[in-house]
Amino acid sequence: MDEYVIDARGIRKSFPAGDAAPEEALRGIDMTAPAGQLTALIGPDGAGKTTFLRILCGLMKPTAGTVSVLGTDVTKTPQQVQERLSYMPQKFGLYEDLTVRENMDLYADLHGIPREARPARYEKLLHMTGLSPFTERLAGKLSGGMKQKLGLACTLVRTPDLLILDEPTVGVDPLSRKELWEILLAMKQEEHLSVLVTTPYMDEAALCDRVYLLNHGRFLFRGTPEQLRETAQGFCYGTKPPENVPTRMVQSRLLTDPAVIDAVPSGGMVRFITRVPDGALPGLSELRLSPQPMESRLEDGFMMLLKEDAEKEKGDVPLYGTDKVDISSFDDPSSHDTVITVRHLVKKFGDFTAVDDTNFTVHRGEIFGLLGPNGAGKTTTFKMLCGLLPATGGELSVAGVDLRTARTQARAHIGYVAQKFSLYSAMTVFENLRFFGGIYGLSGKRLRERIAEVMEEFDLTEKQHEPAGTLPGGFKQRLSMAAALIHQPKILFLDEPTSGIDPIARRRFWQQITALAAAGTTIIITTHFMEEAEYCDRMMIQDQGRLLILGRPSDIRKEMGRPDADMNEIFISIVEKGRSSPSSGA
């Protein structure tokens, strides 16, 4: 058993569910994690990943099964195990009113690290995380990426025998994700650190030695990243849409075909998975598109197993609906009216300039992406566009209304979905919709009609009497969308709408967004999933308050000299180039 830092056998965990049968979160799973390796635990939202991590850390007892961590039965002597492992939960407990160094001191005190051992350890961690220049900065003043790095540094103030991380990069931009993983890989190499990490990012799982795929409390896969990738080999294809047709339109059409396991925009193409020989789908020939074989990726194996499991449970029912998008009727939004105009926009907080002389326009029916690293100024820009924050200078109009003088009037034309889905947990789905409809001025027959319409549109009718707080993540997202659209706004603002949502729910979400845009709704979106930049008609990338680049994804790739690269690579290149230029002040 000593060769494994984790040896779990037959783990079950059930939670009471009132008068109903107990809810089974884990259904008899086995896991072994060898010492000195990086092990990834992946799976959709609600799969049971966090429950399993808490059991391994001795924070929760299993209903059944045995758990040996670092050679010790964690169910009998949890404290003995906890003295040798470090755990970084999703919401790590930084003290925002303490400085970077004070947070590290606090965790060093908690772990009993001798004072004479701290300087060398601190120096190494601060250097690796890039936090050396910020030791006296309050944690609350750090960007999201820097907070995650500080959380990791605090977790590693002692040298643990096992490091357990629960989605350490959710809500973190691609550049910060890359830096965090460089730290993990370096620590594994230098200190022979054993790591178990959960992640929604398949490119991160690909960096690990072993991968476990959990769904509905059961493991669908155990093995190496390469073995998971190979499960989809020979079933992956790509097709390139005509110049004037967005990849999202072709993707949405493909997803309605029961023979398509998955489809996603990537590098200006649409990648898809199908068991149909040579990828020769009738829908492609109708669109005069040709498939070409492609190498599988780890995400392809992930989606293939997840889709097959879902269809076993739900039967032969298309997961993405059957409503076909009419690609022939696509109307390029660049020819439509301008609904958002931004000229020389500036926002200052005291002496700090969060947004500096930014200019852009957005057209009716356009999907426009606001992208950037944590702390880039995109959230500030987003809030000014929504009328939630006044600008310091410049011109800003939304739906023909000047936001400098009539913010309340402009908000009547806007729908807004916040990062954390601003729902009332104790109220039912129906009650939430009635409440938000009332806020937007709907009443009587019109309110009842709109509630019925959005419940049908977002498949919420069967859930209408359930409290919002008990809904799975994907349903909460749908309810937030329904609430934001109940008054039929001209413009929909989406702030990190797919964070923490499983891949199948993400695909459904983008089908709905594609349909909304085709019907004339303008979409403004922020996201850290760079694949989602491919859905945008145009996008802008900000950093340090400055606009670095603006244009169509395909044009931006060409401008960077990499027409076939994925947007993750392009994003990192643009930000690194911007920070190295003399005008960046870096």
PLM regions and their residue ranges:
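Helix-to-loop junction immediately C-terminal to a conserved catalytic motif
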Residues: 57, 386
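Conserved ABC transporter NBD signature motif
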Residues: 65-73, 80-81, 394-402, 409-410
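Conserved ABC ATPase "signature" region
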Residues: 105, 109, 116-134, 434, ...
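Conserved ABC ATPase signature
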Residues: 138-142, 467-471
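Catalytic Walker B motif of ABC-type/P-loop ATPase nucleotide-binding domains
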Residues: 163-166, 492-495
